[in-house]
UniProtKB/Swiss-Prot annotation:
It comes from Rhodobacter capsulatus (strain ATCC BAA-309 / NBRC 16581 / SB1003). The record marks 431 as: Increases nucleophilicity of active site Cys. Comprises of two domains. The C-terminal domain contains the binding site for glutamine and catalyzes the hydrolysis of this substrate to glutamate and ammonia. The N-terminal domain is anticipated to bind ATP and hydrogenobyrinate and catalyzes the ultimate synthesis of the diamide product. The ammonia produced via the glutaminase domain is probably translocated to the adjacent domain via a molecular tunnel, where it reacts with an activated intermediate. Catalyzes the ATP-dependent amidation of the two carboxylate groups at positions a and c of hydrogenobyrinate, using either L-glutamine or ammonia as the nitrogen source. Keywords: ATP-binding, Cobalamin biosynthesis, Glutamine amidotransferase, Ligase, Magnesium, Nucleotide-binding. HAMAP family: CobB_CbiA. This is Hydrogenobyrinate a,c-diamide synthase. Residues 247-435 form the GATase cobBQ-type domain. GO terms for molecular function: ATP binding; cobyrinic acid a,c-diamide synthase activity; hydrogenobyrinic acid a,c-diamide synthase (glutamine-hydrolysing) activity. Its EC number is 6.3.5.9. Pathway: Cofactor biosynthesis; adenosylcobalamin biosynthesis; cob(II)yrinate a,c-diamide from precorrin-2 (aerobic route): step 9/10. Belongs to the CobB/CbiA family. It catalyses: hydrogenobyrinate + 2 L-glutamine + 2 ATP + 2 H2O = hydrogenobyrinate a,c-diamide + 2 L-glutamate + 2 ADP + 2 phosphate + 2 H(+). Its cofactor is Mg(2+).
Length: 435
């Protein structure tokens, strides 16, 4: 049986342990050595894959065991063909995921690592502890669902004495230390309410990536790291999503940037013509398109400019008279009547739906979603079940149109954010991952 690509899973006991910092440093450091490194990210995160791509020079893809079936996961893993190494960054803690399983499991980083045979490098934030860090690592290694543990990398090490103390206990317990990162507050990446500030907004990103690569190369044994990479069987037969149209006008700018790389790759493979346009530059969608797609992003940060984008809104309305328009999360809000910003100012949106949303009183909406369509959505008929993710802080003030879907959380409980449909226009707060 042929092997899949060799790889490593970068995981941790919890969020905030330093996975992304280490991953970006590794991607750039190994790429500088001439290796072709294929990055992946566990779960539905939009932002980390864009940083991965900047660091590695090739697209990073989400591997989501809750929302994706195995053929889709295998198709995406096949993107590593020709690479020398896979670096798979986990999400949250190694075993964290919804309590109720989805399509291929609970969406944990451990499940994906086991599926593709990638040993785990466990990142441990050792600030405020000593030998107890080894007990944490040992517990993770002995978990009944544990993938092979290749070793650990210590983060936020206070001093050489601190490092030596922890290394000695790791050695005693038979755990391999692959590196120790000292405290460096100047290498953190800025954050926004949905996570890191996006890669394209990061001033001096190249310099940051180079600094991270230097830092990781100085404190991680890269040769030892490469020696413990592993692989399982080659990915099985894959399946790519069928695109919703042949010519898609796609909004792409600072307000509309949350597009999953796997969706764009599926469109590319099917020969779709993508026609990008910028609402912030007051550009109307290409009238030759079959479909307009408004992805999510940060429209609340640009609400005034969107409200003033008369050519964009007029072109969108004209398009919607005869052809399909769909919006996700931020795109859904822009299709609505009004968006109220954090200061209480109301901004007129496209008015193709009656939706009114507000950021004046922020409320977190977060989690996986399944959606049983009550009306057709581009590419899917009524009755189809879709899988996605919701993450925003807006509040619905009015949602008067017919519901697009019956939407439930990962536990199967209905949620109020049903989406909307009016004529050729559809929208939802959940970001579609797979159907």
């Amino acid at each position: 049986m042929s092997e899949g690509p060799k790889g490593l899973a970068i995981a941790a006991p919890a969020s905030g342990s330093g996975k992304t910092t280490l991953t970006l440093g590794l991607l750039r450091a190994l790429t500088r050595r001439g290796l072709r490194v294929q990055p992946f990210k566990n779960g539905p995160d939009y932002i980390d894959p864009a940083f991965h791509a900047a660091a590695a020079g090739r697209a990073s893809f989400n591997l989501d065991g809750w929302a994706m079936d195995r053929p889709q996961l295998h198709a995406l893993a096949g993107q590593a063909a020709g690479a020398d190494l896979v670096i798979f960054e986990g999400a949250m803690g190694l075993y964290d995921g919804p309590a109720d399983p989805g399509r291929s499991g609970r969406g944990t980083s451990a499940e994906i690592a086991r599926m593709f045979g990638w040993p785990v490098v466990l990142v441990l934030d050792v600030k405020g502890q000593g030998q107890s860090a080894a007990a944490t690592a040992l517990g993770f290694a002995r978990h009944p669902e544990a993938p092979p543990l290749a070793g650990v990398i210590l983060n936020h090490v206070a001093s050489p004495r601190h490092e030596a103390m922890i290394r000695a206990e790791m050695d005693r317990l038979g755990l391999r230390v692959l590196g120790a990162l000292p405290r460096r507050s100047d290498l953190s990446l800025p954050e926004r309410h949905l996570g890191l500030v996006q890669a394209e907004e990061q001033a001096g990103l190249e310099a940051t990536l180079e600094a991270l690569a230097d830092f990781v190369a100085a404190h991680v044994d890269l040769e030892a790291l490469l020696s413990v990479a592993g692989a399982g069987p080659a990915p099985g037969a894959g399946a790519w999503a069928v695109p919703p149209a042949g010519r898609i006008a796609l909004a792409r700018d600072a307000a509309f940037s949350f597009v999953y790389p796997h969706m764009l790759e599926a469109w590319r493979r099917a020969g779709v013509t993508v026609l990008p346009f910028s609402p912030l530059a007051d550009q109307a969608p290409d009238p030759s398109a079959d479909l307009v797609w408004l992805p999510g992003g940060y429209p609340e940060l640009h609400a005034g400019r969107i409200a003033a984008a008369t050519r964009f809104k007029a072109g969108l309305r004209a398009f919607a008279e005869t052809r399909s328009v769909h919006g996700e999360c931020g795109g859904y809000m822009v299709l609505g009547a009004r968006l109220v910003d954090a200061e209480g100012r109301a901004h007129a949106m496209a008015g193709l739906l009656g939706l009114v949303t507000s950021y004046e009183k922020r409320r977190l909406h977060l989690g996986y979603r399944s959606a049983d369509l009550l009306a057709p959505l581009p590419g899917y008929g009524a009755g189809s079940r879709l899988y996605g993710h919701e993450f925003h802080y807006s509040t619905i003030l009015e949602q008067p149109d017919a519901p697009l879907a019956k939407v439930c959380d990962a536990a199967g409980a209905p949620v109020a954010e049903t989406g909307s449909v009016r004529g050729h226009v559809t929208g939802s707060f959940f970001h579609l991952i797979a159907g």
